[in-house]
Amino acid sequence: MAARLLSLYGRCLSAAGAMRGLPAARVRWESSRAVIAPSGVEKKRQREPTMQWQEDPEPEDENVYAKNPDFHGYDSDPVVDVWNMRAVFFFGFSIVLVFGTTFVAYVPDYRMQEWARREAERLVKYREVNGLPIMESNYFDPSKIQLPEDD
């Protein structure tokens, strides 16, 4: 088990060294002794790059902060940038926050919780007035339920 792990780690280290161009000797573990074999990486010759490095023909991006120190990131034109920023903040804060919170505040009875409470109070009053028990074990009247016949 240990020999396998050492062999695996040795291969990983030699591969990492080969990627960096470092000379490495291959180490192979057999039973309790190490055998050093010549590296296969040393025999391989480095390939010359086929394409020469060229500068990017596109000019560098212009610095928009030099042209507009109050750049907000919406447009390179300063006037359009300011108008877009104002529109985003108007709709983001005025419309969404103000009208959104107003809508949430006036949303009718979420999940009908208030209605359920009022309905329960109404049923309790009805049962007390008519002398019925407040709660019954059967939701439906068992005499009205028709069950299928046993075969």
Swiss-Prot record:
Its main location: mitochondrion. GO terms for biological process: aerobic respiration; proton motive force-driven mitochondrial ATP synthesis. Complex I is composed of 45 different subunits. Interacts with BCAP31. The chain crosses the membrane at residues 87-107. Residues 1-29 form a transit peptide. This is NADH dehydrogenase [ubiquinone] 1 beta subcomplex subunit 11, mitochondrial. Belongs to the complex I NDUFB11 subunit family. It comes from Mus musculus. Pfam families: ESSS (PF10183). Residues 40-62 are annotated as: Disordered. It is found in: Mitochondrion inner membrane. It comes from the Eukaryota. It is a single-pass membrane protein. PANTHER family: NADH DEHYDROGENASE [UBIQUINONE] 1 BETA SUBCOMPLEX SUBUNIT 11, MITOCHONDRIAL, NADH-UBIQUINONE OXIDOREDUCTASE ESSS SUBUNIT, MITOCHONDRIAL PRECURSOR. Accessory subunit of the mitochondrial membrane respiratory chain NADH dehydrogenase (Complex I), that is believed not to be involved in catalysis. Complex I functions in the transfer of electrons from NADH to the respiratory chain. The immediate electron acceptor for the enzyme is believed to be ubiquinone. Keywords: Electron transport, Membrane, Mitochondrion, Mitochondrion inner membrane, Respiratory chain, Transit peptide, Transmembrane, Transmembrane helix, Transport. GO terms for cellular component: mitochondrial inner membrane; mitochondrion; respiratory chain complex I. The keyword Transmembrane helix applies. The keyword rRNA-binding does not apply.
